[in-house]
């Protein structure tokens, strides 16, 4: 249901999972993402914290908490924590994605691109990882590669939920490669 964009149905389904399994990290993180999308930041934070308490060593729970905490916290502390976690799990897609997000907030595009590339290398069908890699390539003035990854992000978004606006990607693709319109 989440893949089809049925957010309210997805929310109910994940809440049912939590009734059976109160510490299900995947359900907690999914509910955090849903709450974030619905503009309920306190609920999202609560779910991320519950996921981390339920499974402190889970890379996705760690990344979700660090990714959102990094917007408010000292970026140097967040970067140090992410790098420490990555030293033990260098191929972790969510940790690399969180590090890329931290770098992008600081306009450190070359470093962001590398972190996003690491996420895509480990989980190449994640539309958000592909999209953020495309954005970083776009900022690094690599229009051909950016366009390629924007297209891959759109293809992946047809199969999995994505946090980006598909219409904006289509518009950006037309700006990058006007001759390749469908």
Language-model features, listed with the residues they occupy:
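Short, highly charged
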Residues: 1-54, 59-60, 64
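Structural marker of alpha-solenoid helical repeat scaffolds
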Residues: 20, 54-55, 87-89, 122-123, ...
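Canonical tetratricopeptide repeat
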Residues: 30, 64-67, 98, 132, ...
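Terminal, low-structured helical/coil segments at or just beyond the last alpha-helical repeat
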Residues: 84, 136-182
């Amino acid at each position: 249901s989440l893949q089809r964009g049925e957010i309210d149905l997805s929310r109910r389904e994940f809440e049912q999972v939590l009734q059976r399994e109160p510490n299900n990290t995947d359900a907690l993180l999914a509910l955090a993402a849903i709450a974030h999308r619905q503009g309920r930041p306190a609920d999202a934070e609560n779910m991320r914290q519950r996921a981390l308490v339920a499974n402190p060593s889970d890379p996705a729970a760690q990344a979700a908490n660090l990714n959102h905490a990094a917007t408010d916290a000292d970026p140097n502390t967040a970067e140090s924590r992410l790098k420490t976690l990555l030293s033990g799990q260098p191929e972790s897609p969510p940790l690399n994605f969180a590090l890329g997000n931290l770098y992008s907030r600081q306009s450190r595009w070359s470093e962001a691109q590398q972190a996003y590339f690491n996420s895509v290398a480990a989980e190449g069908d994640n539309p958000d990882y592909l999209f953020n890699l495309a954005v970083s390539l776009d900022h690094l003035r690599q229009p051909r590669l950016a366009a390629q990854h924007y297209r891959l992000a759109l293809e992946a978004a047809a199969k999995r939920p994505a946090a980006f606006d598909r219409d904006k990607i289509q518009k950006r693709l037309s700006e990058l490669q006007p001759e390749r319109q469908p």
